[in-house]
C-alpha cells in the first residue's frame, strides 16, 4: 500500500504544475525504499551501504550519547530542583559506578529520570528536524535538486551540542543558520566546508552568549534551579566558596585567572583535601617557616579555612603566598579540577556524571560510538587518534614547559597549566567533538596524511584555546571549525607530498 501511494505521488509530480515538488517525493521514496538509480558512468560499485544507510549508521553510533543526554538531563534536573540538600550532597559525593546505581535505585528510580530527560531532549530534537528539514525542503524545491540524507545526522548532532535550558526559538534559529548559511549557500550536502551542526552552535554561542554559558546546564527552567540552589545553600549555611552551584569543569578553569599559581592550589589541597606530598611543598614549607615567626602555633597542613585563607593571601615578604584576597575562591574551586576531587573525579568525568551540554558529558558513551564508527569504516580512526594525541601532548607540554621555565616544580606558574594531560581528554566536549564532529567526511581532509595533520592541529588548538584564551571556556568548537577552514589546504599539501613520493 505504501509503495502504491508513493507511485501515485510520482505520477502526480509528472504534471507540470507539481514538478517542483519532485524532491519531496524523491526524499520520501528514498527514505522508505532502496534507491533504484543505475549509475551511468564509472566507478560502478556494488555495495549494500548507500548514503542513507551510511547516515543511519552514524545515527546508531550516537545512540549511547543520546541515551546519556536523556538520562543525565533528567537525573540532574530532579536533583538540582529538589531543594533537598541531603539529596544533593549524596549526588555530588558519588564516587563510583556501584554507588551511582545505588543512589538512583534508592533515591529517585528510573522512570521519573527518563521521563524528565525526555521532556527536555525530545522538544529540542523535534525542533532540529522540523526546522532543519523545512530549510532543506525549501532549497530543494527552489533549486530543483534532491533532498539529501545529511539532515539525519545533523538533526541529532545539533541538539546534543546545546545546553538543556536553551530557549526553543534560539534552537530553531541555530539549526536554520547551520543548514542555510553553512551548507545550502555552499551548494548543499557534500559542498559545505564547515560542519553544519557545529556552525549552528557557534552562531548561538556568539549571538546569545548568556544563553550558552553560565548557569544554563541543568533542567529546562534556569529560574527554578537557581531558586532551589539558593534554598539548599541557605538551609545548610553554605557560602560561595563551598556552596552548591552549576559550575562545570571548564567554567571553573576559565574563571581562574593566571595570577592563581600552582603553589596556591597545592597549599589548599594539602590543608583542605588532606593530599600528602604536593609537588610544591618545599616552597610552601619555606614560606610557612617565615610565616610562623609572626604566627606561632600555626601548623601547616592542619589550618582552618580562615587561617589558610589568611596565609595564602598574605604578602610573600611576610611569609604568605601572595594571592589576591578576591581570588581565593577561584583557587579553592580549581583545586577540585586539578586534583580530580569530588564531583570532578576522573570516574565522574569518564562515565558522564557531570553537567554540561546534553551530549558531551560521557566519554564512555562517545567511546562506544567511536568503536562502532571505526568497525563499520564510517569514521577515520586516524583523525580520532591524531586529535587525542595532539590534545594530550599539548596539555603535557604546558605543564612541562611551566616547570622547566619557572622552576621550583612550577610553583609560581599559573595553576591552570597543571591539569593532568589525560584529564583534558575527559573535559567538556573533547570526546564528543573527537568522535562525531572532527570526523565529518565532508569538512575534513580525505588524504591519510591530511587526516593526521588535521586531527593533531585540532587537538593542539583545543588545549591552547582552553588554557590561553580567557574569553572561551571551551576550545573544541572553535578548533574544529578552524580545522574545517584549513582542511582543503591540508589536503592540497598532502596530495603534493603523495605525488612527489610516487615520482
From Swiss-Prot:
GO molecular function, one term: oxidoreductase activity, acting on NAD(P)H, quinone or similar compound as acceptor
The family this protein is said to belong to: Belongs to the NqrB/RnfD family.
GO BP field: respiratory electron transport chain; sodium ion transport; transmembrane transport
Protein role: NQR complex catalyzes the reduction of ubiquinone-1 to ubiquinol by two successive reactions, coupled with the transport of Na(+) ions from the cytoplasm to the periplasm. NqrA to NqrE are probably involved in the second step, the conversion of ubisemiquinone to ubiquinol.
Signal sequence residues: none
Keyword Cell cycle recorded: no
Assembly notes: Composed of six subunits; NqrA, NqrB, NqrC, NqrD, NqrE and NqrF.
FMN phosphoryl threonine modification, residue list: 248
Stretches that traverse the bilayer: 55-75, 94-114, 120-140, 161-181, 186-206, 361-381, 386-406, 417-437, 452-472, 475-495
Protein source organism: Chlamydia pneumoniae
Catalytic activity from the UniProt record: a ubiquinone + n Na(+)(in) + NADH + H(+) = a ubiquinol + n Na(+)(out) + NAD(+)
Top-level EC class: translocase
Name of the protein this chain belongs to: Na(+)-translocating NADH-quinone reductase subunit B
Cofactor(s) needed: FMN
Origin superkingdom: Bacteria
Lipid bilayer topology: Multi-pass membrane protein
Keyword annotations: Cell inner membrane, Cell membrane, Flavoprotein, FMN, Ion transport, Membrane, NAD, Phosphoprotein, Sodium, Sodium transport, Translocase, Transmembrane, Transmembrane helix, Transport, Ubiquinone
Pfam entry (one): NQR2_RnfD_RnfE
Lineage: Bacteria, Pseudomonadati, Chlamydiota, Chlamydiia, Chlamydiales
GO cellular component: plasma membrane
Primary location group: membrane
Amino acid at each position: 500500500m505504501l509503495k502504491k501511494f508513493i507511485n501515485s505521488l510520482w505520477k502526480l509530480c509528472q504534471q507540470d504544475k507539481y514538478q517542483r515538488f519532485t524532491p519531496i517525493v524523491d526524499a520520501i521514496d528514498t527514505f522508505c525504499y532502496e534507491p533504484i538509480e543505475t549509475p551511468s558512468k564509472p566507478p560502478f560499485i556494488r555495495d549494500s551501504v548507500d548514503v542513507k544507510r551510511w547516515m543511519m549508521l552514524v545515527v546508531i553510533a550516537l545512540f549511547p550519547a543520546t541515551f546519556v543526554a536523556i538520562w543525565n538531563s533528567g537525573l540532574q534536573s530532579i536533583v538540582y530542583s529538589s531543594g533537598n540538600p541531603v539529596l544533593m550532597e549524596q549526588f555530588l559525593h558519588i564516587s563510583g559506578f556501584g554507588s551511582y546505581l545505588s543512589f538512583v535505585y534508592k533515591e529517585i528510580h528510573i522512570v521519573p529520570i527518563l521521563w524528565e530527560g525526555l521532556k527536555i531532549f525530545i522538544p529540542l530534537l523535534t525542533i532540529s528536524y522540523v526546522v532543519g528539514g523545512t530549510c532543506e525542503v525549501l532549497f530543494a524545491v527552489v533549486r530543483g535538486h534532491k533532498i539529501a540524507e545529511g539532515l539525519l545526522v545533523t538533526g541529532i548532532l545539533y541538539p546534543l551540542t546545546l545546553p538543556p535550558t536553551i530557549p526553543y526559538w534560539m534552537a530553531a534559529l541555530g539549526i536554520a543558520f547551520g543548514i542555510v548559511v553553512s551548507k545550502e549557500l555552499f551548494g548543499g550536502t557534500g559542498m559545505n566546508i564547515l560542519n553544519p551542526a557545529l556552525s549552528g552552535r557557534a552562531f548561538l554561542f556568539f549571538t546569545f552568549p548568556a544563553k550558552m554559558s553560565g548557569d544554563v546546564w541543568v533542567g529546562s527552567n534556569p529560574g527554578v534551579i537557581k531558586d532551589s540552589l539558593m534554598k539548599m545553600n541557605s538551609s545548610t549555611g553554605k557560602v560561595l566558596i563551598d556552596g552548591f552551584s552549576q559550575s562545570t569543569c571548564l567554567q571553573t578553569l576559565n574563571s581562574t585567572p593566571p595570577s592563581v599559581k600552582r603553589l596556591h592550589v597545592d597549599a589548599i589541597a594539602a590543608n583542605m583535601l588532606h593530599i600528602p606530598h604536593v609537588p610544591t611543598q618545599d616552597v610552601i614549607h619555606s614560606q610557612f617557616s617565615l610565616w610562623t615567626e609572626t604566627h606561632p602555633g600555626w601548623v601547616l597542613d592542619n589550618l582552618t579555612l580562615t587561617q589558610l585563607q589568611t596565609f595564602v593571601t598574605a604578602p610573600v615578604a611576610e611569609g604568605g603566598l601572595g594571592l589576591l584576597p578576591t581570588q581565593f575562591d577561584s583557587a579553592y574551586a580549581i583545586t577540585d579540577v586539578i586534583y580530580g576531587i569530588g564531583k570532578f573525579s576522573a570516574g565522574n568525568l569518564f562515565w558522564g556524571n557531570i553537567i554540561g551540554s546534553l551530549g558531551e558529558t560521557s566519554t564512555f558513551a562517545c567511546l562506544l560510538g567511536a568503536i562502532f564508527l571505526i568497525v563499520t569504516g564510517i569514521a577515520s580512526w586516524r583523525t580520532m587518534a591524531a586529535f587525542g594525541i595532539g590534545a594530550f601532548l599539548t596539555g603535557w607540554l604546558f605543564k612541562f614547559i611551566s616547570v622547566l621555565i619557572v622552576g621550583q616544580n612550577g610553583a609560581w606558574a599559573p595553576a591552570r597549566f597543571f591539569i593532568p594531560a589525560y584529564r583534558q581528554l575527559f573535559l567538556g566536549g573533547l570526546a564528543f567533538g573527537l568522535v562525531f564532529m572532527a570526523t565529518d567526511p565532508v569538512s575534513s581532509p580525505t588524504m591519510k596524511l591530511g587526516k593526521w595533520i588535521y586531527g593533531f592541529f585540532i587537538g593542539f588548538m583545543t588545549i591552547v584555546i582552553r588554557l590561553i584564551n580567557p574569553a572561551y571556556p571551551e576550545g573544541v568548537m572553535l578548533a574544529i571549525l578552524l580545522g574545517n577552514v584549513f582542511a582543503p589546504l591540508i589536503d592540497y599539501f598532502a596530495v603534493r607530498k603523495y605525488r612527489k613520493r610516487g615520482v
